[in-house]
Amino acid sequence: MPVKVFTALVVVDVQNDFLENGALGVPKASEVIDPINRMAQTFERVIVTQDWHCADHVSFAANHEGKAPGDKIQLPYGEQILWPTHCVEGTSGADLATGLRLPMSRVIAILKGNDK
């Protein structure tokens, strides 16, 4: 069977909680939105990844008494840095960034970080 080859733009974690005023904001993050919108129109597929955590995710400092973002803890798989609560499934912070205008009929979404 022949393999179908297509072009794809990969958009990684462009979510509200990672924009400047989000729970885990990145300076100037919103500056990528317009270029992504323009480029997305020229690709056959757009693959988007989203951080997608349950509220009691093990990496959230709020779920560990006396711990703060940036602290480290030991887990069975090794050292884990603790983060502010962010990209909780079903919240606006986990949504793709406001302003992204993607051709949804050509989008493939990958949710990650959804294990505990």
Per-segment meaning from a language model:
Residues 1-115:
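Active-site acidic carboxylates
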